[in-house]
């Protein structure tokens, strides 16, 4: 009977390793796609309906975003790794004359969600390098949206596509900001 127990243990370990391998392969494909992204310009893109889980807490520093994403992923039944996951990010709202981070989210399956990112038009801006200019980019995007006869329809969404979990070189970080818009 010992050998049967050992076999079950090994089968479980193999499944875990296969899951980890699949996750890594998917992440490599995601990272490869970033080389085809357009940087430093606002553009309008169409996105499908996206289902999300979220954790709403005061976020006063970048390090707390990782902590909250990890906390959120642990509360989910799905086996996911959010650190370095292009399907996770933070919500940024305009409150009291400033942009503030109000929650973190993870895209998830349809039947397990807290809110929905509606399908439709999104103004996007993707850039590389440090995060210290992100706040001014919200204003830049807002101006671009108005100049191109669109109206903002929700909060800004910040996706950290490549960050400290993939590279130690700050110049290799990639951030994508999205905000839902509609024509005026």
Predicted regions and their residues:
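A solvent-exposed interaction/effector surface
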Residues: 1-184
């Amino acid at each position: 009977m010992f050998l049967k127990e050992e076999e079950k243990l090994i089968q479980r370990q193999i499944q875990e390793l296969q899951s980890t391998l699949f996750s890594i392969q998917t992440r490599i494909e995601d990272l490869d796609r970033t080389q085809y992204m357009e940087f430093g310009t606002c553009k309008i893109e169409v996105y499908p309906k996206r289902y999300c889980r979220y954790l709403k807490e005061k976020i006063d520093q970048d390090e707390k975003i990782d902590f909250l994403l990890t906390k959120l992923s642990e509360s989910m039944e799905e086996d996911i790794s959010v650190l370095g996951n292009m399907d996770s990010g933070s919500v940024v709202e305009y409150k009291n004359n400033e942009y503030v981070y109000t929650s973190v989210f993870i895209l998830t399956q349809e039947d397990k969600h807290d809110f929905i990112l509606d399908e439709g038009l999104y103004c996007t801006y993707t850039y590389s390098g440090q995060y210290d200019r992100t706040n001014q980019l919200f204003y830049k995007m807002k101006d671009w949206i108005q100049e191109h006869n669109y109206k903002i329809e929700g909060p800004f969404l910040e996706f950290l596509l490549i960050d400290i979990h993939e590279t130690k070189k700050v110049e290799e970080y990639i951030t994508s900001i999205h905000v839902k818009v509609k024509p005026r």
